[in-house]
Each structure stands twice: as C-alpha cells, then as structure tokens.
C-alpha cells in the first residue's frame, strides 16, 4: 500500500506495521547486492543476515548511525532483517510483494538450493549494486564483516548473534 510517493507500509509480522521509504528500500537492496558480490556462488540466509546484523551493530557503535533502516527481529537463529526476509519469502512464493519497489528488489535476487540442501541467495544475472547508495563507511564496515563471517559456519554465526544481550 502506498501512503505517499515516498513511503510504503510494510508489516513484518501480523499486527506490526513498519514504514519504509523508497530510499530506505533501495539502500537495503544495495547492501544485500553488495554482500552478494562477495559470495558469487551464493550465500545462505544465516550468513547474509548475520553480515547485515553485525555490520549494522558495529556501525551504530562506531558512528551512531545505521547502515540500513531494516528492522531486525528475533528469530530462532538470531536477528533477522525483516524487510530483507520478506523479500526472500516473496521470491519463495510465501509472502506478498505488493509494491513495485519490493518486486524490483526481489527481481534482483535468486534463490538456489545447495548440494547439502540449504537455500542460497544469489544476485540475479543482471543485478548490480547501486554504489551511490553506500557511503565509504558503509562499504568499509560491510567489507570488515564479510571477511569476518565468510569462513565461519552458519550456526556458529547464529550462536555468536545470540551472545548479544539484545536477543
């Protein structure tokens, strides 16, 4: 549902309402595509979500500003960025992506199944990260957490995110 030309309503869970601007959605999309560039063979949901979470947490500590305005919600395997998760669920056919911006975000991603049966997120063939959406500080923080997380087992990242008292 479009509230104005720049604001969309998005409900991550029944009863919750979160407003996202088109600019916020474009920034989240840029962050996801930037992370996926580091994982050309795809990345599982946990790795994607934890890079986003830890980079966001570190950015808030260091600069007092978030990288993205995605709401992290508590889930079984730790914090999950609600809008990003909704887009992935939409690709799976399990959530409605009613706005053109969310559909465009979904069109920039693919989901595949790994040999061991895990869902992998990949950038679509022609999808490109809009680097104009990312600051130098954003890129530096994302690079730091991509490097820290890339060789760590998914469930170890999940455990690490549970160490945070916020969850």
Which residue stretches match the model-derived regions?
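Domain-edge interaction signal
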Residues: 1-167
